[in-house]
């Protein structure tokens, strides 16, 4: 199974949720430097089956061959392990990627390797409204026009909204330090959210915006929704 979507849409959270629903199943997680140990990890999974092998950011080892010089031995290791699962082996591969467009065709399209792909899209308006409520925590979110805030965040991810509220709280605390005590919820208004949004959309924060999953629509939010 392949989970794909831009950064910040919740792929890692989804993996954790799925694994939490599988009691008694061995989980082998490959991420970062551990990606170099594909064969060893799969051997452990076969020994301790039923098992799930989670390969995070699989695009790091499975990019199109044309993007790299020479062959990718890690890619071949992964393909060999996925091909080598017989009907008597209870091992499932769960892959995640931010860049499905870069995946090796042999990995993404051949039946038996990845037989189900699920996109985690950016949240729609209703989901963004729920995320505002979820991430406000103990903040006193005093918004005069919540619908405008939701409209102005079209195209962003859950991570973006979480960071937006964090920065808005900092703006509010800087504005009135006396109101930012540990026992008093910080009051965040439309003005604070707008100021935080301007920070995130600043051209000098382009990398931060990308990492948080700020979509194309955010480019126009500095001046409000198009009309």
Predicted segments, located by residue:
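C-terminal alpha-helical "lid" subdomain
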Residues: 125-227
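Flexible beta-alpha connector loops of hexameric P-loop NTPases
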Residues: 25-36, 61-73, 117-119
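Conserved Walker B
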Residues: 57-59
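A short helix-turn-beta junction within AAA+ P-loop NTPase domains corresponding to the substrate/partner-engaging
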Residues: 105-121
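Structural recognition of the conserved hydrophobic beta-strand(s) that form the central parallel beta-sheet
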Residues: 54-55, 91-98
């Amino acid at each position: 199974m392949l989970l794909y979507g831009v950064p910040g849409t919740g792929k890692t959270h989804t993996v954790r949720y799925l694994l939490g629903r599988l009691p008694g199943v061995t989980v082998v997680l490959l991420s970062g430097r551990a990606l170099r140990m594909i064969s060893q990890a799969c051997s452990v999974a076969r020994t301790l089956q039923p098992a799930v092998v989670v390969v995070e950011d699989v695009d790091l080892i499975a990019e199109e061959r044309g993007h790299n010089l020479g062959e990718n031995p890690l890619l071949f290791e992964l393909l060999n392990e996925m091909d080598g699962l017989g009907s008597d082996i209870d091992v499932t591969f769960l892959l995640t990627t931010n860049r499905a467009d870069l995946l090796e065709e042999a990995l993404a399209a051949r039946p038996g390797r990845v037989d189900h792909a699920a996109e985690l899209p950016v949240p729609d308006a209703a989901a963004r409204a729920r995320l505002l409520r979820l991430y406000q925590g103990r903040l006193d979110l005093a918004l005069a026009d919540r619908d405008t805030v939701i409209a102005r965040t079209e195209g962003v991810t859950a991570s973006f909204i979480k960071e937006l509220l964090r920065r808005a709280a900092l703006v509010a605390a800087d504005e009135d330090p006396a109101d930012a005590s540990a026992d008093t919820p910080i009051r965040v208004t439309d003005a604070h959210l707008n100021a935080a949004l301007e920070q995130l959309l600043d051209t000098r924060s382009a990398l931060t915006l990308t990492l948080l999953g700020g979509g194309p629509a955010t480019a126009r939010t500095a001046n409000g929704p198009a009309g």
